[in-house]
A protein has these predicted regions:
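Long, charge-rich intrinsically disordered scaffolds of nucleic-acid metabolism proteins
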Residues: 2, 12, 69, 76-195, ...
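Two-metal-ion RNase H-like nuclease active-site motif
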Residues: 6-14
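Mobile genetic element proteins and their domesticated derivatives, centered on retroelements
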Residues: 13, 21, 52, 79, ...
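Nucleic-acid-processing active sites and adjacent nucleic-acid-binding tracks
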Residues: 24-54
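Acidic, metal-coordinating catalytic cores used for nucleic-acid/nucleotide bond scission
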Residues: 53-64
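Short, solvent-exposed helix-loop connector elements
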Residues: 116-129, 151, 240-244, 271-288
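Phosphate-backbone recognition surface of nucleic-acid-processing proteins
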Residues: 201, 206-283, 315
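Low-complexity, acidic/Ser/Thr- and charged residue-rich accessory regions of DNA metabolism proteins
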Residues: 237-238, 272-316
Length: 316
């Protein structure tokens, strides 16, 4: 649905060194360097409140988004996968910086009514997300190195010492996570989520972090924010395969998958897990189903400020 509010519409294609800018009125293309001083000068030239569409590009869009928001403009961060499909849907035959900037402006003009403007996340969200991502990179590197050195015995003792140093760094990251949570007054929320079978400290931290990013009205919106809502492709009598949208932070989904692998062995969820396996579902499908259930339970606990009641317990 086209935007109803009369605002100037701008599409910006972001690269590391350059911003290619399309102004819908007066149908003008321009470019500036992707540096704060240049961005500030350009923002001052805009005619009043403006709606700006930007494709998320690594971290290169962050300065533009934050400065535009501070200047009073509405900023819309567009998912790259969604924009790519939109290009195909409207018959786009080329992909250049200029065409992407035009496409972003067109997308915002036609679909803006259904989009939500970007708002800055709470400070604690950025800190927790940064620490969780750094830890994920650390563990990924450790796993890769351990596998590649598995058959090399000549430096086994030295490598073992190296792995222990990685483990110590991991513990320091987790300690820092607890400090951030304590300063933000969120340790109680983490403990509330940890009461759920399979959910440990890291998964609980990720769930609390995600919950504090937005004002979620329902479990469905929370699941969608985690990128665990389903993409449906049905037509006539044919029911297509379901896929996760996988939007948002991939580390939260990875931690939830690990939590589901642990929960499926617990008394509370073993029956659920085996039932769906016996119905013919694949292991990954069942683990995704269980991950979604765990996330929904965590959301309900945080939303209602209630305590977890294990399956079979009497709820007062």
């Amino acid at each position: 649905m086209a935007m109803r509010v009369s605002k100037s519409i701008v599409g910006v294609d972001v690269a590391k060194a350059e911003l290619v800018i399309y102004l819908a009125d007066p149908d003008l293309l321009t470019s500036i360097t992707n540096e704060k001083p240049a961005i500030k000068r350009w923002l001052k030239t805009l005619p009043g409140p403006t709606a700006i569409a930007v494709e998320a590009t690594n971290i290169y869009h962050v300065d533009l988004v934050e400065l535009a928001y501070e200047s009073g403009h509405d900023v819309y961060i567009i998912d790259g996968f969604q924009l790519s499909n939109y290009r195909k849907g409207v018959g786009g035959r080329s992909k250049t910086d200029a065409s992407d900037a035009r496409l972003l402006g067109r997308f915002l003009k036609n679909e803006g009514e259904d989009l939500r403007p970007w708002t800055p996340p709470p400070a604690v969200y950025g800190k927790l997300q940064s620490l969780l991502r750094r830890r994920a990179s650390l563990i990924q590197a450790k796993t890769s190195l351990t596998q590649s050195w598995a058959n090399d015995t000549s430096l086994k003792a030295v490598f073992a010492t190296f792995v222990k140093s990685i483990d110590r760094l991991d513990l320091l990251v987790q300690k820092k996570l607890k400090e951030v949570l304590r300063e933000a007054g969120l340790l109680e929320e983490v403990a509330r989520c940890q009461a759920i079978e399979g959910i440990g400290f890291l998964t609980a931290t990720a769930l609390v972090m995600a919950y504090n990013r937005g004002d979620f009205t329902s479990g469905d919106s929370y699941i969608a924010f985690l990128g665990m809502d389903l993409r449906v492709s049905d037509s006539g009598q044919k029911n297509g395969r379901r896929y996760l949208t996988k939007r948002g932070c991939s580390e939260v989904r990875r931690l939830l998958h690990n939590a589901a692998m642990s929960a499926c062995r617990s008394n509370a969820w073993k029956e659920f897990y085996n039932h769906h396996l016996n119905c013919g579902k694949a292991t990954t499908q069942v683990l995704v189903m269980l991950s979604r259930k765990l996330a929904r339970i965590a959301f309900a606990l945080m939303k209602n400020q209630s305590e977890y009641q294990p399956k079979g317990a009497v709820i007062a």
